[in-house]
Amino acid sequence: MDLSVIKAASLDLESLPSQPTVSSFQQLRETFIQSKSEDWYLKNGLFFRYYSFLKSSLENATLDGPSQVACLDTISVWLRRIFNACKQDPEISKYVWDTMELKFWTNLFSLPANKISIPGLTGVQVAVKDVFSKSLQLYLLVCPSEDIKNDFLLDSLKHALHWDRHAKVVCTAIQLLVKVTGAEAVFAFQPDFFEQSLKLLKDYSYAQAISSTILTVLTLRFKSLSEETEDREEVETKWMNIWCPIILYEFYGNDRQVQAGMSSFLIPSLLGVSPGITVKFLSRLQNYPNVSKDARDAACLYALKIAKDSKIIKNLDLVKEHAFVKTLFKHPDIKIQLACFRLIALCPNVSSPLSFEDFDCLESNIEFSFNVLDPDSRQILLKSMQDFFIRLRASCHSIARTMRSRHSDKVALSGLLDRAMQFLTSFISVCKKHLYPTCNYQQVLVSLSFLDTLISFGLDDNVESSSIREAQHDFPFSMVIIDRDLSRLMIDRLKDPYDDIRNLCLKILLSYKSLPGFISDSDAYFLFNHGLELLNAVRSHECDGGAKTIYLCNHFMEKSVPGSVLANTKVILNRLKSNIEHAKTSLLEAAVNCPLQGYLIQLTYIFQSLSPTIVKNDNESWKNIVMELIKASETIWGLIKDVLCDDSPEGNLPDGEGEGGIVSNLEDTPAQLILSYSWRSLKETSSLLTVLLTKCLSLFDEEFTPFTLNYYGELMMTWLWEIRHRGAFTSVYPCFIEYCSFLFECNKHEISELPDPWLHKNLSVIQEKSSFITRRSGGIPLSITAILVAGKDKREQLIEQTVISLISIAKQPVEQKNIAGQFDLPQVHAMNTLKTIFTEHRLSSVSVEYLEPAIALSIEGFSHELWPIRNCSVMLFTALINRAFGSKKPKDAVNLGNNKGLSTKMFFSKFPTLHDYLLRELEVSVASLSSNDQPSTGLYPILNMFSRLQYAQPYGNENEWTGLSQFEPLIFKCTASRICKVREIASLSLTCLLDCSKMTTFIVSQLKGVAGLQQNEIHGKLLTIRAVLSCFFSKLTLQQVQEFYEVVPLAFINCFLEFTSSKTSFYAKKLFLEVLNSYFMSNTDSNAKRLQQLRRMTMDYCKRMLLDRKANVTNVFNTIGLPIHQQMAATIFLENLKEFSVYCDAHSIGFLVSKLLHYEFYEVQLTTLRSIVDSPRKKIIVNNPEILQALIKLTPRNQWSQVRALALSLLSDSLNSTSYRLLGISCSDMVSNILSNECLPIKESFIVLLGSCIKQLKTENFLEYKVTFAKWVEILLSYSNEYQPFSSRKAALDSIIHFDLFNAESTAEAFSFEFYILYLLLGDFLNDDDEEIRSLAANHAYQVLGTSAQCVTEIWNLWKLRTKATFGGQHDFQHCINKRLILEDGCELASVQLDNALSRNCSLFERERQNLYYSDNQKLEDLLFYASYPNEKLKDWATDGINAILSRFEDVSRDGPLGKTSDPNVWFTIYKIIRIAEHVHLPLDRVHSLMNRIDGHPSFCQ
């Protein structure tokens, strides 16, 4: 653009429009930039000529958003040029001061409050910040009077402190002003500045800006204090008194968001202001009153981390000053343990070396990392360990470099390097220990993840360079990470039940140049044969393990013996063909003895990784194999087709398969075996076929013509069309997507065009009469969706023609002959396909364009005469709503005011045609509703959509959007409908029509004129009020909340009598009470007089309705809804009973509660019981005589089970000698109830109660106590094992807790019989699979132990010591331990247990352990800790076991990896025999010699 033209146009004021635009502002800004300096010195220069224009533009409220930003940018340049001119010429300064009015200065300084954001624009705050800073610079320069300057700036600061600081520009403005006015002014204007600012840290996105503002003020205050006195200690103390008490309060509080904001930004900066601050802060943390030692230590740990991350503290002193850190590894919270590890192991300076104390602490506590159960914490742990290895490598490299220096202390530095190597060696051995069979999932996963990370650091020379992460430096030493034993453990884990463990093991082993420990060809072939055996397994994870083993062998064998992959593939192919032949004879026999899935998985692995180099070496052989496999896929399909295509494949048994001797020996049903065999075979066949077709086209292009590719594509579609088993056709779906993607991306035109006609063929299939609509159209929708997903470049075109065709099919009228209940409706197939298309996330960006016609289609389908079409319309509508509005919402969820939701304006701008359509449909539905009280079924989806929308909030100068003005009266009519469901959903729909700021006015208007309304109208108004409050109440500002409680309670008081009159239905009354309870009864502000009056009126009403029988109507018709009304009244009455007890006349609280427990409606009884259960004063309440009597009366069999169960469990908290006699149920009766066929909650309540009763029985009837105690222990044993449900195990634990081991332990008779079992059971609960049960058990255990709260692992160690010290010498205790040690599934002999473990189980599923927290070998070691020596019982058992091992493995030539001794069941049996033999000092030389000879598991060899 010609600059002279710009100047000429812009300098002419007449050329500037009255309503400036972006272009005019840009021209003017360019003029200011290009102008000469002398143009600004003249009194009639650029400053004066454009002052009025810019002043009016700044005040112009009609400018659009972009023009406002352009105006600010222009003013910024204008201010900068004036500032430069004023610096050069004082006369100009005076002229500027005289010219610029106070109002203009005020507008400039108010910009951060008035221009925080402009909808649809970015960079607004940057522009405002620029203008504000330049305005402040200019004002400080031109203002002639210090008094005027100070007054104006102080006034500006006063206003700025009340601005919304959830904007960075506001924070910047305050900082700029404070630097001029001083920090004292801040505290003078806002004494609670620091407290208010801390609350703002809750929003993490603004925490940095707010922290910077706080720091600016406090730093200035520190400087002013330093000027007052030279005593640094006094200055630091005074300064810390300003902020430290509030920081400490929040530090120990519960607001995690504020704590996160403080820790990340504020505290590090505060601690860095002065060197002595950190020490003082830690001292104040440790001496903070009224918190536990654990909490103080955890807070100090947090502060140390902040200081270390900020480099305020470089090294920890774990011996003296920071010794408490080591104890925090035993903290109950795993997050604290993890933070402790990170504090020691990590450092901002990665080359900073660890001390000997650091290594010792980490090494002694590293076990904690293998017990991290929470997935999120485990991810943090793995990332922390990776960072630790980075630091370790960098520090070792730094040490080695320093050692080369002439003046370095080589001995000390060499010692540090040796200690690092020792630590890594110890760490690897710990990881190895947690890979043994029976170790739990998280231990194995963490161990493998650690090893996978460690090998990527280049420590092991045998690791491939491609597996080593890039780094600037390496470890100065090398070491073997994966040795033969670890390699063996990982190979054994290749058949682990968990996919991620199998994959991780394979990844680690493939990272090596040669398989560690297995370098000979014989080793490879031995592994290969073991893999072949696993391929024939029935269970899928074992098949996959065999396939991964052979894949591993192929990887290393091909390096040493080229052609091994081809030879191995031929072997697998021959076995596959043999198994196919068996299937032709009998599917059942094939499913049991000759499955296909393992071989198919292995072949898929082979061809996925097959390189062209290997193929070129023997092209013809590979081609023959490929063609045989492709033909085999068709043969397999022919064998299993009848099973998978049956209308009921789950129960289908082909003719003749149920006969023969094989059936009698099966652990699974024949139908289940055949079905599993069939669908898994098809799953792997489809994967293999896809790999062959996509991989081999480039290798054997002459064999894979377009005709061939088309044929097998149609074969896959046939699978999707005809298969009725969901698991089978859903497994084909991803394979078909992959195949179609391959074809679409092919460079050959004739191949890339193949999927197009398939799409038309699929649409034709939809209209065929042979396709049944059951099972949601089966795989037909997936067949179409797969093509759409695959066609990336053609996706828009394909979806357009597909969706239009499907909608057209769905709208076709149903033929009259199909109305009688036929199952071949193309309309249903079309809708189900549309649902699948809109559900597929990979099509979301394209499919959303067709939501409008699809929504209209689904709404119309709601009213269809055929149920199948109505049904799939509902499913389609749900899919469309989720696509339009995002994630699913829970049932009956109210529009909770999510600011990120879709507003009405945005929704109808995205889908404009829906506006008129929905309005037309809603008018028809409401008219139908008004005329005959029969709603059109389309009414529900329309109202449902509106309930998902948000109010269209206007921004800036925008007017309120009125696009829903025609909908509003229609929806309001629905709120008064005679149909309750319509009223409910309509009330939710109204929330999108209401501005949050107008909520109070709206509610008051709804409450006016209630008198004379019909019941449906009253109920609708209350539903509307509830919905509005649920949506908006949490979004109100403090001022709006105050206004709400000033105005709304009076409105409720005025219509209280109408809502509670006898004419009002109990449904409406219940809703009225629900609203009052949710939003008014919990507010105890004594200054709100009207609110308190409303609360008293509500309480009086609830009391009258509950306790005054005359207040309840006797007409049966008028009592509809009375039970739920009374339930809500009871809820309010009980929650506020203590506060309003003065209004309860002369009746005691116990009398009132007992009255409710005797109430005629069980709903009221349940509410009362649950209120007592949830009360922190539960024990005091239950022991009230009147309440106790009432609870006892609720225990007979004629009571409702829910009521009875709660009453029984509450009685366990009340039992003393008096209440036990009042109960009227003997302990033997309780035992009988537990052993009877009572429902489980009743049994569990009796179990809890029995623990309390036995505690009382001990003091009254010791003989009965002994008999009952034994029965109680038997019950606890049966209800506490890991296969019982959570509630039963918790009931058993609660029973022990109510028995109270702490008090019972001191009695002499406690040790005369099976008291020790309770200790063992509590130990079991300390190792339960559920964290809640472990925590409850730990709480009771540390009370008995008399220790502070620690982590469960540490509590368990202390509990073992106490149990052994107390009972270890008792014969019965040792007998019990022996029984626990040697008994397995009811079998006692070791030889029989070993035989059972060695016998192969061919069932589809193994019995899995439910306790994944406590492994078998951990349990064994703990029991051996209790076991005595000498012990003849264990000695005999171990002798039998040793003999069994020697005899069973005598003829084995080699066991090796994946062998019998690696099987978890076999391994544990042998391990248990060996460990018990070691415990009783039996010689094991022959066992070790045998295991060495047969290459048994490493843990058995010496």
Swiss-Prot record:
Q: Which Pfam families match?
A: DUF2428, TPR_Trm732, TPR_Trm732_C
Q: Name one GO biological process term.
A: tRNA methylation
Keyword Iron-sulfur set for record: no
Main localization category: cytoplasm
Looking at the UniProt record for this protein, which Gene Ontology cellular component terms does it annotate, in alphabetical order?
cytosol; nucleus
Disruption phenotype annotation: Loss of methylation of the 2'-O-ribose of cytidine at position 32 of tRNA(Phe). Increases occurrence of 1-methylguanosine residue at position 37 in the tRNA anticodon loop of tRNA(Phe) and decreases occurrence of wybutosine at this position.
Q: Which GO terms describe its molecular function?
A: enzyme regulator activity
Signal peptide limits: none
Keywords of this protein's UniProt record, alphabetized? Cytoplasm, Nucleus, tRNA processing
Compartmental location: Cytoplasm; Nucleus
Q: Which domain of life is it from?
A: Eukaryota
> Which PANTHER family does the record associate with it?
DUF2428 DOMAIN-CONTAINING PROTEIN (PTHR14387:SF0), THADA/DEATH RECEPTOR INTERACTING PROTEIN (PTHR14387)
Q: What does this protein do?
A: Together with methyltransferase trm7, methylates the 2'-O-ribose of nucleotides at position 32 of the anticodon loop of substrate tRNAs.
Family, according to the entry, reads as follows:
Belongs to the THADA family.
Provide the protein name: tRNA (32-2'-O)-methyltransferase regulator trm732
The species is: Schizosaccharomyces pombe (strain 972 / ATCC 24843) (Fission yeast)
Q: What is the lineage of its organism?
A: Eukaryota, Fungi, Dikarya, Ascomycota, Taphrinomycotina
From the UniProt record, report the name of the gene that encodes this protein: trm732
